[in-house]
Structure formats: structure tokens, C-alpha cells
């Protein structure tokens, strides 16, 4: 037997058998076959040929009047498909002299959504070959129908196509055709349109994604549980005989991560969030806030960076340098000793009053004036000690040796002005 020559364009025997099968019978397809045509392929290779009465190579698309069935009954009417099903279906008019199609079905109706989508050819001309419309099935009667998850994509040919199929499926309402009986009018609008039916499953997909998120959260909590147990064990070891620390460790809660209060350095350190392995651990692990604080103090210690930050400084803080302006530099050859004050003049009445009050208090040697009047003028912030003693040294009072050393350590310079010096030049 002579084998067919593939170069001559003849089809293999399997394809020939498919071409010779009767319309409406189930197609004989090899395992693993999937029917996923594009919009252009559906219109050009299937709908146009069907409208022009050209035989199709495989009857994979069944001929069914979709509007005589409910969408959940259509999968068993299809020749092929698992998640989506394809049908050739006629369309009828809703009114005898109108162009609107009748969308009513057995227990509901199909409602169009959005606008028509043009289908363009993939060639260089980019010609419009068809139109795609999306519809949703509603149970009941309009306008109180209940929306379902059944979707239909309806493909029809364009009006301007030059093919014979376009003439047969034009959207322009043809003149009514009188039937055999008197007064009978045909309601046929289109001989054939191609429809794809499927059930939307977005809600199920969203539920599946939600379950996946929950699983990931549970995995993260399970991964963190061993580290939480280790922190609780360490807290129990550091607490020793402390009852609160023992309770916190026994119930598996990392109470040290709630709050830490250092009584020596007077600081609060927040290390993390309060964690517990179960919901009952929070109520049974500690009966009061004081027990939580005791467990935190026993379990946690301040870090090295905190100790370094809060360590006392060997240099005393000078309040006058923080709040008063810096003293101006004196020209060379001038001295700030008490014998040169005669060549200087205070610029304001307040400074003059301050000088007079201090001089009187120091010259008279009155302990009450010397101790109370000077802080009222020189030390308005209430800073005592070495800073005040330094001012006494500046104003000319005699000081003990330890007071003089403390005053020299402050390095404070009181601002004076020269009467014959222009500071702005």
C-alpha cells in the first residue's frame, strides 16, 4: 500500500477519518489534546466557515441553541471541554421588527457587560474580522435577577466583511419572512454565532490564597516558638528564687521583652513585644503588672551602648554656656583684672545694677547679701556650687583654695564691653 506523501499536502489517515465523521459525533482526539484557540482563530477558522457552510475538519464545536438551556446544563451538551465549552448557536430577535437579540433562557437571562471588543486579524492589514461580547447569566427575571458565576463570550462576524458568511450573519434586521401559516413571522436574527461558556472561579482562588497566607503565618509562629522558649528558660535561670521570674518561665512567656526598668540608671528599655505560646499564658503567667515588671528586671540587662550613653561625665555641665551668649574676645594688651574695670563701662542699666549689687555685697562682707543677692542676679537658674564661686572670683571676692579650683574648672567668662571699642567694625 502506497503511503501518502506529506509533501503533496495529503492528510494522514487519522485526519481523513476525522474529516469523514458525521456532524454532532464526539471527536477522536489523541490524549493530551487541548483546545485553546485565540479569538481570531475562532472567528476566521471556525465561525466564518460555519456561516458559509464550509465543512470543518473536526466537529469539536457542537451545534446547540444556548437559549433553550441553563448554563449548568450545557457542559453535557458539548463535544469537548473540561473547564470551558464551545458551541455554535443561532440567535433570535426579541421583537419581530427589531434588531435586539432575545437573551432569555430557561430559568434566567443573559445580560451583556461592557462594550463590544473588536477582533483584528494578525496580518499586515490588521482588518477587523469579528466582534466579541461578554455576558453574565442571571437567575430569575429582570431587573431582579440574581447574578451567577456563569460567563459567556459571544463571537459574531462584522457587518462590513466581504465574505458570504458576513452577509449571512449581518446585524441589520432582515425583512420578516412569512412562514407557511398565515401571519407567521420568522424571528431569526443570526444563523450562527460562536459562544464560549465557562464558570468563573475567582472566589475559590481568593479563598485558596487566603488559606495559603494563614499557613505561612502559622509556619512563622511555629518557627519563632523555639526561640521564645529559649528566652523563657534564660529568664528562669537569671531570676533564681524570684517567684515572679519562676512563674514567667514556667508558663513559657518571654515577659522580659515587654518592659525593662533599670532602677540605678532610671531608664526604660523596650526590647520587643510580649509573646506567649498560648492564649492562657498571659492570664496565668502573671497575675499583675508588678509581677511582669519584676520578671523583666530579673531577666534583662541593659546593653553596653545604653551603659555608655548613661555613664556620668567627668566634666560638669555649665548651664551658663547653654543659655547665655559667649563672651567676646578682648583685644591684646587689655586685662580683665579688677584694677582695669575703671576703663570699662557697662552698657545697660541691668548690668550696672548687677555690678553695684554685687560690689556692695562683697565690700560689706554681709553674709546675707553676699549669699542671697548674688544668686538672684548672677545665678537666675538656681545653679549653685562651682559656677557661683567663679562669679565671686570674677567680682573680686576672696575664695578658699578648693572654691577657686572649682571656679577655674568651669571656664566661665562674663561678658563685658569696652567704652571706646567699636565691636561692629
UniProtKB/Swiss-Prot annotation:
Keywords: DNA-binding, Nucleus, Transcription, Transcription regulation
Conditions for induction: Up-regulated by drought, salt and cold treatments.
Primary location: nucleus
Subcellular locations according to the entry: Nucleus
Keyword Ribonucleoprotein: no
Pfam families: NAM
All residue ranges annotated as the NAC domain in the record: 29-200
Annotated tissue distribution: Highest expression in stamens. Expressed in leaves.
Residue span of region Disordered: 1-34
Compositionally biased tracts (Polar residues): 1-10
Low complexity: compositionally biased ranges: 12-23
GO molecular function terms noted in the UniProt entry: DNA binding
Record has Nucleus as a keyword: yes
Role, per record: Transcription factor of the NAC family associated with male fertility. Involved in anther development, but not in senescence. Reduced expression of NAC5 via RNAi leads to male-sterility.
Free-text domain note: The NAC domain includes a DNA binding domain and a dimerization domain.
Protein name per the record: NAC domain-containing protein 10
Amino acid at each position: 500500500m502506497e503511503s501518502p506523501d506529506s509533501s503533496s499536502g495529503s492528510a494522514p489517515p487519522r485526519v481523513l477519518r476525522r474529516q469523514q465523521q458525521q456532524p454532532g459525533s464526539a471527536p477522536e482526539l489523541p490524549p493530551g489534546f487541548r483546545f485553546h484557540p485565540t479569538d481570531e482563530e475562532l472567528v476566521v477558522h471556525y465561525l466564518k466557515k460555519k456561516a458559509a457552510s464550509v465543512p470543518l475538519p473536526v466537529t469539536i464545536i457542537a451545534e446547540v441553541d444556548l437559549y433553550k438551556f441553563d448554563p449548568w446544563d450545557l457542559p453535557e451538551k458539548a463535544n469537548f471541554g473540561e473547564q470551558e465549552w464551545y458551541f455554535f448557536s443561532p440567535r433570535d430577535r426579541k421583537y419581530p421588527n427589531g434588531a435586539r437579540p432575545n437573551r432569555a433562557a430557561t430559568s434566567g437571562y443573559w445580560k451583556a457587560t461592557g462594550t463590544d471588543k473588536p477582533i483584528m486579524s494578525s496580518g499586515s492589514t490588521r482588518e477587523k474580522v469579528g466582534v466579541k461580547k461578554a455576558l453574565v447569566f442571571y437567575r430569575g427575571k429582570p431587573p431582579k435577577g440574581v447574578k451567577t458565576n456563569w460567563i459567556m463570550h459571544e463571537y459574531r462576524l462584522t457587518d462590513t466583511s466581504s465574505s458570504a458568511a458576513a452577509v449571512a450573519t449581518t446585524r441589520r434586521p432582515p425583512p420578516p419572512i412569512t412562514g407557511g401559516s398565515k401571519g407567521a413571522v420568522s424571528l431569526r436574527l443570526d444563523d450562527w454565532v460562536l459562544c464560549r461558556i465557562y464558570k468563573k472561579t475567582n472566589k475559590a482562588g481568593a479563598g485558596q490564597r487566603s488559606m495559603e497566607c494563614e499557613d505561612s503565618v502559622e509556619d512563622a509562629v511555629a518557627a519563632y516558638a523555639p526561640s521564645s522558649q529559649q528566652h523563657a528558660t534564660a529568664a528562669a535561670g537569671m531570676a533564681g528564687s524570684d517567684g515572679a521570674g519562676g512563674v514567667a518561665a514556667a508558663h513559657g512567656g518571654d515577659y522580659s521583652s515587654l518592659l525593662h526598668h533599670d532602677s540605678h540608671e532610671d531608664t526604660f528599655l523596650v526590647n520587643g513585644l510580649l509573646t506567649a505560646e498560648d492564649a492562657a499564658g498571659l492570664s496565668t503567667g502573671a497575675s499583675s503588672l508588678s509581677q511582669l515588671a519584676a520578671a523583666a528586671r530579673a531577666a534583662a540587662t541593659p546593653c553596653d551602648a545604653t551603659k555608655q550613653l548613661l555613664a556620668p561625665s567627668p566634666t560638669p555641665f555649665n548651664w551658663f554656656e547653654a543659655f547665655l551668649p559667649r563672651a567676646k574676645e578682648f583685644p591684646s594688651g587689655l586685662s580683665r583684672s579688677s584694677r582695669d574695670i575703671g576703663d570699662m563701662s557697662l552698657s545697660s542699666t541691668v548690668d550696672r545694677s548687677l555690678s553695684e549689687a554685687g560690689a556692695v555685697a562683697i565690700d560689706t562682707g554681709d553674709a546675707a547679701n553676699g549669699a542671697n543677692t548674688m544668686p538672684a542676679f548672677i545665678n537666675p537658674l538656681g545653679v549653685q556650687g562651682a559656677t557661683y564661686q567663679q562669679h565671686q572670683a570674677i567680682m573680686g571676692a576672696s575664695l578658699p583654695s578648693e572654691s577657686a579650683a572649682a571656679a577655674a574648672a568651669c571656664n566661665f567668662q562674663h561678658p563685658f564691653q569696652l567704652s571706646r571699642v567699636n565691636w561692629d567694625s
